[in-house]
Design a protein with these regions (language model features):
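A general structural motif
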Residues: 2, 63, 90-91
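Helix-rich interaction surfaces within compact, conserved domain-sized segments
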Residues: 14-23, 30, 76, 80-122
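Mid-chain, well-packed structural core segment of small domains
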Residues: 55-86
Length: 122
């Protein structure tokens, strides 16, 4: 699998910064548009077939979110460090797994939000 970062909710300056970071590290960047949110995240990595119906494409993801797939440990460390240095981090980050590759963007967002709330003790 090609090292890829999926970007949800990125535009403007943040998207430009993310593009720069990914280009420097030879990581493919794929911006996911709101119209594509209902697709399983695995679709964008070539692992899961597209869906015809399902969740509404207008379900919002109110924060920036990234999904990382196919990165080596070194690439992952370099990416996270570069994003921190550039102050362009996403509120929510996930690594693609066999468990979440079939989830839509909004479903992944809900799960990551729950995990963050549990870790924050909310």
């Amino acid at each position: 699998m090609t090292a890829t970062v999926l970007a949800y909710g990125y535009d403007g300056k943040e998207l430009k910064t993310l593009k720069t970071v990914c280009a420097r590290l030879d990581i493919r960047l794929r911006r996911v548009t709101a119209e594509e949110y209902a697709q399983p995240v695995g679709v964008f990595f070539g692992l899961t077939p597209r869906v015809e119906s399902g969740e509404s494409a207008d379900e919002a993801i109110p924060e920036r979110m990234i999904v990382l797939g196919g990165l080596t440990s070194r690439q992952l460390d370099a990416f996270l460090s570069a994003m921190k240095t550039a102050r362009a981090g996403a509120s929510l980050k996930a690594v693609l797994t066999e468990h979440n590759e079939r989830w839509s963007g909004p479903a992944l967002y809900v799960e990551l939000s729950k995990e963050r709330a549990a870790m924050d003790g909310r």
